[in-house]
Curated annotation (Swiss-Prot):
It comes from the Bacteria. InterPro entries: Hydgase_Ni_incorp_HypA/HybF_CS (IPR020538), HypA/HybF (IPR000688). Involved in the maturation of [NiFe] hydrogenases. Required for nickel insertion into the metal center of the hydrogenase. This is Hydrogenase maturation factor HypA. HAMAP family: HypA_HybF. GO terms for molecular function: nickel cation binding; zinc ion binding. GO terms for biological process: protein maturation; protein modification process. Keywords: Metal-binding, Nickel, Zinc. It comes from Escherichia coli O6:H1 (strain CFT073 / ATCC 700928 / UPEC). Ni(2+) binds at H2. PROSITE patterns: HYPA (PS01249). Belongs to the HypA/HybF family. Pfam families: HypA (PF01155).
């Protein structure tokens, strides 16, 4: 379960930004999860709640967004998007020579803070 490690690192970054902007607490966090990141969203939500306990982000609303993986098809020379690792064929030409160009793992997209 690597979700706990991802959440711990995300919390470090969230706390840094909260301190930088004088936040009393974090009220919302938006995370983008890459299609091929092997992150289980329910586990991520559970771990996030767990690591945030006792921090400036305790009780904040977690918003999760799943991102499609962008790939380059060597066969038809087109950019295509895939939703899952199980589908490894180009949806346009059905070729199997795909190169992942954007999956982005896990990204913090937005942090909402309360400064009062």
């Amino acid at each position: 379960m690597h979700e706990i490690t991802l959440c711990q690192r995300a919390l470090e970054l969230i706390e840094q930004q909260a301190a930088k902007h004088g936040a009393k607490r974090v009220t919302g966090v938006w995370l983008k999860i890459g299609a091929f990141s092997c992150v289980e969203t329910s586990s991520l939500a559970f771990c996030f709640d767990l690591v945030c306990r006792g921090s400036v982000a305790e009780g904040c609303k977690l918003h999760l967004e799943e991102q499609e993986a962008e790939c380059w098809c060597e066969t038809c020379q087109q950019y295509v998007t895939l939703l899952t690792q199980r589908v490894r064929r180009c949806p346009l030409c059905h070729g199997d020579m795909l190169q992942i160009v954007a999956d982005d793992g896990l990204q913090i997209r937005r942090i909402e803070i309360d400064q009062e």
